[in-house]
Amino acid sequence: MKNEIFDNMLSRYDLTTEQQKRNAIFEVNQQMILAGLYARGFFESAAFYGGTCLRIFHGLQRFSEDMDFSLLAQDDKFDFTKYFPAIIDAFAMVGREVEIKKKDKKNFGKVESAFLKDNTDVYDVTFQTEKSIKIKIEVDTCPPLNFKTEQKLLLQPHSFMTRCFTLPDLFAGKMHALVYRAWKNRVKGRDWYDFEWYVRHNVPLDFTHLAERCKQFNNEDITLELFKEKLIERLSTADIKQVKEDVLPFMRNPKELDIWSNDYFVQLAGMVRIE
């Protein structure tokens, strides 16, 4: 369905291939979801984090599919469904019909649930106009704390603010995922790409928040030395071919990966700044 606002948002992207078009539609839809959440006041009690946050607000040069949110304080009675109408209304303004459903985690396989806490609710946003596109939203209602946030501006579909984790805390979440995530019996290359981005941009790692994540997710009282050991072990033993294959569909320039090797990432680990 043609819509001036939606089409204008899409026009900022390279739509040459079907994969590029799919990635662009994903990202425009993600921004529409953020606009809906802002309209209902969601960011008064929650913050955006993860790879999609890094992509939208900090220019990460890869596309990202899922959307991760953390409450600012633990609240096991938090009801995300009250934000559904605002998300639906945001899409209706650009001529799109969406459906939002809470997923039953009892139906998750071991792989899907391996990195998902009991206190994380999962929702799927599906689209009538793009049947193949489904955006998964995760909301951690009992999150690891000791993180900082900031307000970040988006101008489309209209001007609004999104509360986001600061970069050092985004980095902490990514490093926890890189070291501990078990994902389809292989590594998630997107974690590695993001790790490279943080080091290249000289972002310090908030170890206090990282330690909080390790304690809550893994019941580990981690020290900096032990974490470095775990990181080096993961980086030096992973199958780099699998790492590259996972991230390729989300890349604008695949040649960026030519230099990737186990040694390359081990050297990156030595460049991580701790705060």
Where do the language-model regions lie?
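Structured mid-to-C-terminal alpha-helical surface segments
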Residues: 1-31, 36-46, 57, 72-275
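Glycine-rich beta-strand-to-loop/alpha-helix junction loops that act as flexible
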Residues: 49-52
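Short glycine-biased active-site loop of nucleotidyltransferases that positions the nucleotide triphosphate
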Residues: 55-63
